[in-house]
């Protein structure tokens, strides 16, 4: 079976947070209570290291929270981020991060396929990190009003043992979703880069399952 591949998109000058990104792949929340689980793989371009190439799973509205796989000088990190008043340009905050294990990808071609009429160019060595990401949404009652949605974000290296990513010392922390300016809250994926370069890394979504 195939996978959905999202190449990282160069963000415009003056980019502030995901609220400025035109390339979010989102859908409306299907219910007040649901769980979305995805198996993903991130393959950043090593030539863009330390320049903000990232991808992840986001719950988007006027505020947002996300599980974000980011390529850094220390390797690929999985970050839990939140941003309040995103549409007004607020800065995103990294509240928790853990390192991910990455594996080298096979070299795409060998020297026997190289042209003999031009100087040889060493192929770029890519590494990939796989992860299972989970968004769990639950309603919270409000007196005299409709319930508000709260969300927790979870990570697993194997799809079996899950760990919530939350601010340090705040186990059970839940993000409160806010509707978008014109629509309700949405969830989905993104893959961005801040560097202007022709070649990009990518995110592959093997599958996503939405359950009660």
Enumerate the predicted regions with their spans.
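Extracellular glycan-recognition regions
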Residues: 1-212
